[in-house]
Amino acid sequence: MPPMKRFICLLLVAAASVSGTHAQRVTRDIPYATPHERQVLDVYAPAGAKSLPVVFWIHGGGWQTGDKTMVALKPKTFMDAGFVFVSINHRLLPTVEMGAITRDVASALGWVHRNIAAHGGDPARLLVMGHSSGDQLAALMCTDDRYAKAEGFPLTIIKGCVPVDADTFDIPAIIEMAETRARVHHLPLPTYGHRQKFGDDPAKHRDFSAVTHVARDKGIPPFLILHIAGHPDTTAQARRLAAVLQAAGISAKVVAGRETTHSSINDNIGAANDPVTKELFAFVADALKK
C-alpha cells in the first residue's frame, strides 16, 4: 500500500475508534489574552505528545452563545489519530462588537503558535476548523492575513481550513438574500440579524467576509468546506467561497453532508462510518503533506 494511502487508513481507523487505548490529558481554561472569563482555551493532548499537528477549533452559537466544551467526539478522535486539539472561547455579541471577537480568535491563534510546543504540538502545523459562526471566524483567520501579521506568525503555519456549515463567507450576499426573501414573503426583518451583528455598515460587512481577502501568494491554505445538503444558504455560500478560492489558485473542495442537520454534521465528526469524517481525514492527510 502506498505510504499516503496507508496514512489515510490509519487516520480513519483512529477516527472510528470508540475507546482509545492511549492515555490523554486536557489542560483547561488557559488564558490567551487579557484577563476575561471568555478569553481562555482548552488543550487536549496525548500523553507524551511531541511535535504533533494541531487542530484549532472554534465553537458555534451565532457569535452570541456557545462554549469551548461543545466538542462532542472531536478531542478523542483527533488525539487517537495523533493530533493535539485546542478548543477556544471568545467574547460574545452583544457585549462586544464583532471586531473584538475576531481579535480574540487571532490572539488565541497567536498563543497557540507561541506556546503549543510545551503541550506537545507543532506550532508550524495548524489546522483551523469551526462550526457555524465559528467557521466564519475560521475562514476569516485563514484568508485575512492581517490577523496573523498582528500576532507575529506567518499564515503558512496554517496547513488547512475546515469550515463546517456556515452562511457568512460573503456577508453582503447573505444579507441581501435574507432581506429579499423577507420582503417577497412579507416577513418581518430581524432586529438583530447579520446586518446588525456585523456592524450595520457595508464596509464592515465586506471586511468580515472571507471572500473579500482571498488572493494569490498570501499563503492561504487549502480548504475543505463542509455543509448540509438540504440548506440553500449554506450550500450557496460554500460554493461561493470555493469558487473564489479556486479562481485564486487555492485548493478548495466542497462536501455536502447527506441526511444531516446543522447540528449533526458537527456532532458526528469522529463517529464510526460517518462520511463527512472520512472526507475530513483524507483532506487532513493531504494537507499535512504540504
Regions picked out by a protein language model, each given a short descriptive name:
Residues 19:
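Cytochrome P450 heme-binding "Cys pocket" and the immediately downstream C-terminal segment
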Residues 15-16, 24-290:
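Alpha/beta-hydrolase superfamily serine-hydrolase fold, recognizing
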Residues 7-16:
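Sec-dependent N-terminal signal peptides
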Residues 1-7:
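Positively charged n-region of N-terminal signal peptides that target proteins for export
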Residues 4, 23-24:
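Absolute protein N-terminus
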